[in-house]
Amino acid sequence: MSNSKENKWRISVVTPTLRRPEEVDGLLKNLSAQQQLPIEVIVVDGAPEHENATELVVNRLRDSLPFAVYFIRHNGGTAIQRNVGIENAKGGLIALLDDDVRLEPDFLKKMVAVFSSDADSHVGGVVGYRTNRHFAAADSQRWRWYKRLRLLSVYEPGRYDFECGYPINNNMQPPFAGTREVDFMTTACAVWRREVFDSGLRFDPFFSNYGVLEDAHLSLRAGKRWKLLQCGDAHCIEMHSPNGREDRRKIGYKSVINYYYVFSDLAGPLSAGQQFRFWRFQAFELLRITMSAVRRRRLDDVRDVTGRLRAIGGLIRRTRRNERTLVINAKS
């Protein structure tokens, strides 16, 4: 990794993908319209060797793009794919972009302006504003219940609740100008100072195969040393492509296991109060999705509940094993 003075504000884009050739095509064309062009785009494809649709897209567009584009085949899930891209990036700034995100033409220029105004280099990362993802908590029945039952101790978008282990959805932030400080950043549209990664920080291998909350885990670890900001002037949209996504059973499972891992890793050892608040929140989520499955008769909700129950059972069994080990060690 190089970070010479002339390289300081040059941007490398890292994008993991899986079976989304059309989305990658759209992203590369979108990036070519940026007022401040990246020096390179690194596409890391998780598809097996015989599936070459995305590689063909990259090869077809390569010569017409105003930046270098590299194709790397590497599976293991988006967290591992991003690590591979980061290792190969040359820019002083590294943009982590999802393949289904489309940036406004001045997006990268606005991001660079935030970093260049940070004279003391305290800012480690800046996340953009997804204009099509905003919702108000008052309009969400789920979030109204969260507040009514006092399940959370903080409700500011972009903050992490260290009392119950839940990240507060950044999309609840109304449109704004300038920057504001956050605890975590999505990997959909964030730009990082390369020194953050030069220090050795990477996405945790725990999030291999299918990541849920890997972005918050990375951000919260980075936030121990660096300031993280959201730029309200750097606009983009997220199309939320249905292609290449896992089934709801795995998402439900990860929504328990990964949340517990992040909470215990960053706030542990967890107190009895933190454990209670974590499981109270998980119990509410299980009840909410179960009721949705009954009311709407949606198979996806049933799969979600099945995954959550499997995860809860696994964590309970692991806790009991750990307790037995402690007792045995105490007696020996």
Please describe what each predicted stretch is:
Residues 72-89:
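Glycine-rich, basic loop-to-helix element that forms the pyrophosphate-binding segment
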Residues 185-189, 209-218:
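Acidic donor-binding loop at a coil-to-helix junction in glycosyltransferase catalytic cores
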Residues 1-33:
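N-proximal low-complexity "stem/linker" segments adjacent to membrane-targeting elements
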Residues 28-71, 116-118:
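Acidic donor-binding segment of Leloir-type glycosyltransferases
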Residues 79, 157-162, 168, 172-192, ...:
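A recurrent flexible, glycine/aromatic-enriched loop bordering the glycosyltransferase active site
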Residues 106-155:
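Conserved donor NDP-sugar-binding/catalytic core segment of glycosyltransferases
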Residues 250-258, 268-332:
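Non-catalytic, C-terminal membrane-associated alpha-helical segments of glycosyltransferases
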